[in-house]
Amino acid sequence: METKPMTLPMVPLRGIVVFPKVVTQLDIGRTTSVQAVKAAMDKDQYLVVTAQKDESIETPTLEELGKVGTIVKINQMLRLPGGVVSILVEGVSRVNVDTILSTEPFYEATVTPLESIHEDPMEEEAYRRILQSKFAQWVEVIKPNTDEGLDHVLGSADASEWADQIAFLVPLQLKVRQSILEELSISRRLNMVVG
């Protein structure tokens, strides 16, 4: 993925933060968001998703959205009754949402990809071990006798991906998830997820 600014269709999300490397399903119902998905499908299947601060707003402004979002690749799209589309997406990279170029017929934004910052590998490893232990305990409480979720996350060697995957999986408030998405320091991000 390029590190220079780019223009992509954008979907404001209600109640969810999508992280890089996370695969999730999104049900899209807002007309402008459905149009953004169609525009992405007609081009290269990439779009930007970012969380709304207030879910009740129908047409959020730049200030009413998270300043950091995620470029996602649409892997699958299914049309549902009532004009809703369900998309299976995979997070690609964090982006700063620089400007909204248009809101009709769909949101289009200029975004700049953001790189994670490795400050102290030893500190990252320490937080990672703590997080591994806490996540294993959480999985045991939520889904006893299964290693599936644990293996998926623990299989990654990347501390940044660990923090993002676990922040997406464990129950956290939307504001906390958005703060984790906005944090570029991997050590601080791991610490935020550890709680």
Name these PLM-found stretches.
Residues 1-195:
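N-terminal low-complexity, acidic/polar interaction/targeting segments
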